[in-house]
């Protein structure tokens, strides 16, 4: 967090919504790709719910659509998602969320929520940015 004047909450919400809506459109592309790759509606929805990082979702579906081994596809998706653990280490300190909330917040630790959070000048703004981006994308 940079030192300086606090950013108005409305500006943080605006920025977070902008990122969330723009990136959220890739969810539509994922649905189309998933359907084209042979996954059913329930499988696609479960994948979106449980594997929140888009890169991992697209990697898994792409590998399966190309006839890849499901275990290999899952391993590739897993390793793409591991980078989020490193984001989580930084965000944990920055957001300083209560312990009871952290497991739920961990689901939202992705590139976009990290970028919006780190761009904020105060802890309050960082929490708002993280939450609004996470809600918008989830």
Specify the residue positions occupied by each region the protein language model found.
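Residue-level signal for short hydrophobic patches within transmembrane helices
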Residues: 10-21, 46
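Transmembrane alpha-helix boundary and packing residues in multipass membrane permease domains
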Residues: 31-32, 61, 89
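The first (N-terminal) embedded transmembrane alpha-helix
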Residues: 18-30, 51-53
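Membrane-interfacial helix-loop connectors
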Residues: 35-37, 42-83, 95
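Helix-loop-helix junctions within the multi-pass membrane cores of secondary transporters/permeases
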Residues: 3-4, 74-138
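Selected transmembrane alpha-helices and immediately adjacent juxtamembrane segments
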Residues: 17, 32, 36, 135-138
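Small-residue-rich segments of transmembrane alpha-helices in multi-pass membrane proteins
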Residues: 23, 52-56, 106-110
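Short, Lys/Arg-rich, polar N-terminal cytosolic tail immediately upstream
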Residues: 1-11
């Amino acid at each position: 967090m940079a030192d300086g004047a606090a950013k108005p909450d409305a500006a943080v919400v605006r920025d977070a919504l902008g990122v969330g809506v723009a990136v959220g459109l890739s969810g539509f592309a994922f649905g189309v790709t998933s359907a084209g790759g042979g996954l059913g509606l329930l499988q696609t929805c479960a994948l979106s719910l449980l594997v929140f990082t888009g890169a991992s979702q697209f990697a898994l579906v792409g590998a399966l659509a190309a006839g890849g081994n499901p275990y290999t596809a899952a391993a590739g998706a897993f390793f793409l998602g591991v980078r989020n653990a490193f984001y989580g280490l930084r965000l944990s300190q920055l957001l300083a969320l209560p312990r009871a909330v952290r497991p739920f917040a961990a689901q939202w630790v992705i590139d976009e929520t990290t970028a919006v959070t780190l761009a904020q000048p105060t802890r309050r703004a960082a929490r708002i940015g993280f939450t609004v981006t996470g809600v918008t994308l989830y």
